[in-house]
Amino acid sequence: MVEGSCHCGKIRIEVEAAPEKVTDCNCSICRRYGTLWAYYPPRQVRIIEDVPTQTYQWGDRSLYFHRCAECGCVTHWSPVDPARDRMGINANLLPPDVLAAAQVHHLDGASYGGFTR
């Protein structure tokens, strides 16, 4: 089990295993958020909320981006469609030693027309 949290600790994330790779996307929203995404099936992720997350949608509105209402850290994204078997956690919330072992995949989301705003 690997655990991470937002800055204030009121949103905690537990995943079954450390990510082997993370995605650094440069689309308009990921670039602004400064996230590294690690992807998991939702059943392998546990989100513990001491305060509710705030959500944001844009573009095709297929994802909810979650952030801590207290400290503002982007914590994860979840699909609008519950049948979609993938979600992303902000790997920057994991311990640095866990993140250091992950391979970084650079995704040119800025060149994909669906990710611009």
Language-model features: where?
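A short Gly-Trp-Pro
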Residues: 1-5, 10-117
